[in-house]
Amino acid sequence: DAARRDFRLNALYADGEGRVFDPTGEGVADAAAGRIVFVGDPETRIREDYLRILRFFRFYAWYGRGDPDAAGLAACGALAEGMTRLSAERVSKELMTLLAAPDPRVAMAAMAGAGVLAQILPEAATGPLFEAAVGLSADPVVRLMTLFPIDERLVRDASTRLRLPNSTRDRLAAAARAAPAVGLTMSDADVRAAVYRHETRAVADALHRRWADRPAEADGARRLLALAEGWKRPPMPVGGRELARLGVEPGPETGRLLKAFEDGWIADDFPTDGHAERLAALVSPPRG
């Protein structure tokens, strides 16, 4: 059994009295030193299950110290194309668990350098944005977001290919959609407008991305995040009923007028009164 395990530190056994057995003779030492080393020949172990490539990097992200094992890293790179045989669900589960590690930066850089990341996520790129995001958020979805460019369709396509949960796919797409409206120089009114149009989570995720791009602006980013997460999105204060009272028949004109009202209401930072007058002015604009 030990000879077919993936890593030497996974080939440890204990009896009912707590005595540890280490058939490879290296498992205990590996665990103590943070070494992730395949049992026997790395390529043989990988060919038994190509998911072991991702497990190598996932275990390293969580438990590894020092440089990744050179032989294991080389074998992962050499056999990376074999991961195309894996189900998307198995791949995405390993990737998200890796990204949830306290500090996955070295593991992700090693994956990219070995050509493994490109096999599972060719759209992704590690670099300063991802590295900064790891220090700002422990959320694996925020970290994954910073591997992608700001492109909603690309993000959706990649998420669908990986068969990420619908909630994760939709969250990534919403953040990409909100990103053009979000920046660290936003006014408070701009933040409220963005939250109203894009929802709190999407704006907060986009702000994390902007913060990772400009980590020196931490104080401003924190303030904007607190505002976005603390502001309660108000309901639209008027609807078709109010327009009907002004003589507007249901139909396309109703939608146009409500959209015009909403745009003005947002631009004025969500005033709480004067709605009837504003709506009446849209229905019967002043002449002159």
Predicted segments, located by residue:
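Acidic, glycine- and histidine-enriched catalytic cores of nucleic acid- and nucleotide-handling enzymes
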Residues: 1-71
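A residue-level signal for conserved active-site and pocket-lining positions in enzyme catalytic cores
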Residues: 2, 49, 56, 107, ...
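Charged substrate- and nucleic-acid-binding regions of tRNA-handling and nucleotidyl-transfer enzymes
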Residues: 19-38, 210-288
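Short, conserved phosphate-binding/catalytic loop or strand-edge motifs used
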Residues: 26-32, 71-80, 87-90
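Conserved phosphate/pyrophosphate-binding and hydrolysis machinery centered on Walker-type P-loop NTPases
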Residues: 46-50, 85, 101, 229, ...
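Short, amphipathic alpha-helical segments that act as regulatory/interfacial helices
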Residues: 54-61, 99, 112, 258-262
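Short, well-structured alpha-helical segments
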Residues: 73, 108, 169-177, 222-225, ...
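Conserved, hydrophobic alpha-helical core segments of structured domains
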Residues: 81-219
